[in-house]
Amino acid sequence: SLFYPQAEEKGLKFNTVSEGMTEELYIGDSLRLRQILLNILSNALKFTPEGGRIQFTIRQMSRGDKDAWLRFTVSDTGIGMSKVFQKHLFESFEQENPNISIKYGGTGLGLAICKNLVTLMGGSINVHSIEGVGSEFCVDVKLGLTEESYRRKNLDLLKFRDLKTLIVDDDIVTCEHASLIMSD
């Protein structure tokens, strides 16, 4: 991951977790999703002091026939933010106070852009934060399933285990081999 070396250099514990994922590939706007997640992870790195922790979690929340809802969560033990500021967090040029801008830099545009991109993707972005404790950002988006996923789901419905198969060949070894393969 792009963030492991940066986290290590800053003395942070960084880990990733994958929960409930049934697919390896999804269809969606990978460029925009990457932009959103990189921004949130960059903020977590920026606002988490040495010795802190950042966790990136991907969870499949639900799955339909042709799409699935995924939740990307970034949680940190950073500086957190006040409840009042959280209401304005996704507005352009917003930073909690001038000292934040001086100490950490930034324009206050990143999360406003993230919010717009997530909305354009038909998803949502939320934050839960406690000042002095840390923050948790959740991005929920619906992504399409690949043809392979769709076929695999439909194959599962056929329940091949209940079917009988006739294997015919003039070579007994070939028949035994085919029988072994089909029994799995």
Question: Where would I find each of the regions flagged by the language model?
Answer:
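Short alpha-helical segment within the cytosolic histidine kinase core of two-component systems
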Residues: 1-9, 180
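Glycine-rich G1-box
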Residues: 5, 79-80
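Disordered, acidic interdomain junction associated with two-component signaling
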Residues: 9, 17, 63, 67, ...
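Short helix-loop "hinge" at the ATP-lid/N-box region of the Bergerat-fold HATPase_c
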Residues: 44-45
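Short conserved segment of the HATPase_c
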Residues: 81-95
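Short alpha-helical Gxxx[C/S/T] motif in the catalytic ATP-binding
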Residues: 96, 105, 110, 114
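Glycine-rich ATP-binding loops of the HATPase_c
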Residues: 122-128
